[in-house]
A protein has these predicted regions:
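Nucleotide-activated donor-dependent transferases that construct or modify glycoconjugates
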Residues: 3-16, 25, 201-202, 307
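Structural motif
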Residues: 7, 102-103, 124, 148, ...
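Active-site and donor-binding regions of nucleotide-sugar-utilizing enzymes
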Residues: 10-32, 39-183
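Conserved catalytic-core segment of nucleotide-activated headgroup transferases in glycan assembly
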Residues: 21-33, 179-252, 324-326, 357-363
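Structural alpha-helical scaffold elements that stabilize or flank donor/cofactor-binding regions
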Residues: 94-97, 118, 142, 193, ...
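A short, gly/pro- and small-residue-rich
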Residues: 116-133, 220-223, 297-309
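Catalytic binding pocket for nucleotide-activated donors in carbohydrate/polymer assembly enzymes
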Residues: 168, 288-356
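Donor nucleotide-activated moiety binding/catalytic core segment of transferases
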Residues: 246-291, 296
Length: 364
């Protein structure tokens, strides 16, 4: 039986780090579409604020915004250090919208499983990459459950076709929509430090087994405390703090008071492109944030091999071709000195940029 009500759903029910990848495609669809109701569903107040801020900038408002209320415990300050509820707790609140949708666009790998749990089978499902990472996670078999996958560029297309059972017409290269967000949102004149010294941006990943955060955070902080001629933005992925209680580690760097060190464990600036646009040298491990860094403009990168990984022929560490990989403090100090002088990886960054990101007049 034909569905009487037609709607297209854009789901913003993951963390805020997903929103910046989806909000511009969602708004552009809403602007072009006048036949089918466009619905944005937000899973927490931070997501809602990002959507509303971007709506105000673009002037696009012909969509319905559904804001799922937070459970009471999440309205309490510092509830288990959690920033927002898990995705699966949001699904039950929006069943009627899911059942009435013709198509759903999600950034969550597990979303088809949630639909199956509630026996919702009809909508056409789109998955949009929330980043440009190269780890196995981005190519797992759960993606085969989507009807269409919206990807950044050639690298992901080729690897998906090699790894999964997908047809050509299921994969669409759209570029990196977050870059479109950065173009309209970023302030070019923002100043974070009261000096003109080089700014390093340390951005460890949230997955502790792979991240440099626990093993290297004190090393990094002490180095910059002793070297006042450098500035440091110390800003891990927000999930580092979000998962700290669950994973049993402490966040003890919040109270550092040094003129040359900015510690940010979870503000919007961690994710909205502020730091990647202002800093001069990137320090990281396995985060795909480095591709955002290179795509804004090629600059030096330092990667910390905190777990002594044999990375050179490992596709999960493909992005380490962007810069210098260090295993110990001595190598780190050398890499810092070298990075101030010039970007010796400039040419390969430009080549890899073309492999990773499909470009057209409008990427999303």
């Amino acid at each position: 039986m034909a569905r009487q009500h037609k709607s297209i759903l854009f789901l913003f029910i993951n963390g805020p780090h997903h929103v910046y990848h989806l909000v511009i495609p969602a708004l552009r669809f809403a602007a072009l579409n006048n036949k089918i109701e466009t619905i944005f569903i937000s899973g927490n107040p931070v997501n809602t604020q990002i959507i509303n801020d971007t709506k105000a900038i673009t002037g696009i408002n012909n969509f319905t915004l559904v804001d799922i209320p937070l459970p009471l415990r999440y309205r309490l300050k510092n509830y288990k250090n959690r920033l927002y509820p898990p995705v699966y707790t949001r699904i039950k609140k929006i069943i009627k919208y899911l059942e009435n949708a013709n198509a759903i666009i999600s950034t969550s790998h597990n979303f088809p499983d949630y639909l199956s749990r509630y026996k919702i089978k009809a909508p056409t499902l789109f998955y949009l990459y929330h980043g440009t990472g190269t780890r196995e996670y981005g190519f797992e078999t759960s993606l085969e459950k989507f009807d269409h996958i919206l990807i950044p560029g050639k690298y992901h297309r080729d690897r998906l076709k090699e790894s999964l059972s997908l047809k050509d017409d299921q994969i669409e290269m759209i570029g990196k929509p977050k870059l479109d967000y950065l173009k309209i949102k970023l302030s070019k004149n923002k100043k974070l430090f009261n000096n003109e010294n080089p700014i390093f941006y340390y951005n460890p990943h949230w997955e502790i087994e792979l991240s440099s955060y626990l093993k290297w955070k004190e090393i990094i902080l002490q180095f910059f405390i002793k070297n006042k001629n450098y500035n440091l933005i110390f800003s891990p992925h927000p999930l580092v703090g979000h998962l700290s209680t669950k994973r049993g580690y402490e966040i003890n760097e919040k109270d550092i008071a040094e003129d040359n060190i900015l510690v940010d464990m979870g503000s919007n600036q961690c994710l909205d492109g502020t730091y990647t646009s202002i800093a001069d040298i990137y320090i990281g491990d396995i985060s795909s944030m480095v591709t955002e860094w290179v795509l804004q403009k090629p600059r030096p990168c330092i990667f910390i091999n905190a777990h002594n990984v044999n990375w050179k022929n490992n596709e999960n560490y493909y992005m380490w071709k962007f810069g210098k990989v260090v295993n110990e403090l001595k190598e780190f100090k050398e890499a810092v000195t070298e990075s101030i002088s010039f970007n010796q990886y400039n040419e390969i960054q430009k080549i890899l940029k073309s492999e990773f990101i499909f470009t057209a007049d409008k990427s999303s």
